[in-house]
């Protein structure tokens, strides 16, 4: 492969369920690498397992990618749909002498391996049909096997792992086409990547051994070998391979926990890749900075505290439109009702104050409770203690004092302080009944932030409801 070829990457998930967090990171790395080089990011659905590959599972993958904000070029490619092309290549390898027909049965192969095991030999199958005379082949079902080199080495020149060498004696003559005519995964992947023009294969390092075998197919067909980059897997906080015992493993779970997509892109990009000491960045920076040299060899560890920090940074810097879109996506992910126009109208002016303190969308919405409720405000038991007779009287005075105020923060705060001083009370004592009246809770954002967000009419109405 020459450096002049436009960059083409691909994400090739098997649609057997939701999009795993590891798969999401692999997709992100491919997307960033392509987008940062004006290349193409392609999507292939490896749906050859017809029992597990369902339309619903495929849609779950697509939904996960859409939520994460990863757009792909062209239509998704179905691997199953290319099975005739895969078979065509297997037969082309028969013609050029790099593959052969193998008539060995499953029972014969198993017997070979059992005997080899008993004798302490390698159990790699050595087909007796590898060098058989074509004129003497039986008229029977056969598989097509790669005539892999027996001597020497196959080197995977990996952009992350470095050169990884495999002795050819340890790589068997893999099956390319089964006796029922169906292609194997190894063949299908190589043919699809070649036909799609893929220049860089960025995937998990659990595929590293596969790369050596796939290189042999590329060489047999005389095709350009793509750049391989095998990235380390994601581990849990205990250093073990990520699993459900560590918490959320599906991307949809993170969406339901209220982490914005922008924060997930930032966090996942840093999970195994680095650009100096930069921890927080936007998409434009990630696309410009991302390269394969920055990917480490060691497994990355999931860190929820770091994720919350990243999430808080992204929430704080979002504009109102973007943040409201994220909130809508979050509520959809959790099955909650969409916010009404009235709720959005009250929430929008509150976002500036709320977003600087929230680490997640649920935390923001919890603080935004006052903007999402309607009159009459339900008063929680703890907040009700701040609405005794004296406090209601003070609230009534404050209501009258701010009735005709210019409704700016300084004016509202000055009025509250003046009422407090007239009763020998601090601002906190005046704010407590006001807080209860506006939100029905004892823990809320600043009372003046709430008053500004709710506006004059709604604020006065809530105050009057409790002032008596």
From Swiss-Prot:
It catalyses: tRNA(Glu) + L-glutamate + ATP = L-glutamyl-tRNA(Glu) + AMP + diphosphate. Pfam families: Anticodon_2, tRNA-synt_1c. One of its GO terms (cellular component) is cytosol. A motif ('KMSKS' region) lies at residues 241-245. Its EC number is 6.1.1.17. It is found in: Cytoplasm. GO terms for molecular function: ATP binding; glutamate-tRNA ligase activity; tRNA binding; zinc ion binding. Its main location: cytoplasm. Gene3D superfamilies: 1.10.10.350, HUPs. GO terms for biological process: glutamyl-tRNA aminoacylation. It comes from the Bacteria. ATP binds at residue 244. Keywords: Aminoacyl-tRNA synthetase, ATP-binding, Cytoplasm, Ligase, Nucleotide-binding, Protein biosynthesis. A motif ('HIGH' region) lies at residues 13-23. Catalyzes the attachment of glutamate to tRNA(Glu) in a two-step reaction: glutamate is first activated by ATP to form Glu-AMP and then transferred to the acceptor end of tRNA(Glu). NCBIfam families: gltX_bact. Monomer. Belongs to the class-I aminoacyl-tRNA synthetase family. Glutamate--tRNA ligase type 1 subfamily. This is Glutamate--tRNA ligase 2. It comes from Paracoccus denitrificans (strain Pd 1222).
